[in-house]
Amino acid sequence: MILPIYTLGQPVLRKVAEDIPTDYPNLQQLVADMYETMAASDGIGLAAPQIGKSIRVVVIDLDPLSEDFPEYKGFHHAYINPHIIEVDENAPMATMAEGCLSLPGIHEKVTRPTRIHVKYLDEELQPHDEWVEGYLARVMQHEFDHLEGHVFTDRITPFRRQLIKNKLKAVNEGRFRCGYKTKS
């Protein structure tokens, strides 16, 4: 089922999400709905707070980028109770433009670490403890930020935030257009 995307201004986007128990009701259906919602919105990542649930569940599908990133062919994963454990301080930082389904029409350059250590459960509730780098590390950080009550514009410079304040205000007030169902 395609769910509405919660946009900036919805309180759930500013809450720290809770870990869920492994017997969370209808988890597989929730993950399936998140994948369907993300695909219908032309996204590559979606966190549960973006659909109004303050729980630590994220889906990422990088297959649409596989023409530019062949290593992501067929890549789609769910992350249950994910946490960033550590950032590789020796790895370089990288700056790239980011956008977000919860901030329609806003794109800004964000600087992030290129290598992170994460722990999570997969869709079968199997534990993973791994270092992730490159573009996947960026997408994970963006989505995991939602679980901590942050959006990507929290990570831009105050000067850039000032320049886009009217766009942010418009999204916050529900004055925007996009091609997917939203809740503002």
Which residues are covered by each model-predicted region?
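Active-site rim/adjacent substrate-binding subdomains
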Residues: M1-Q141, H146-S184
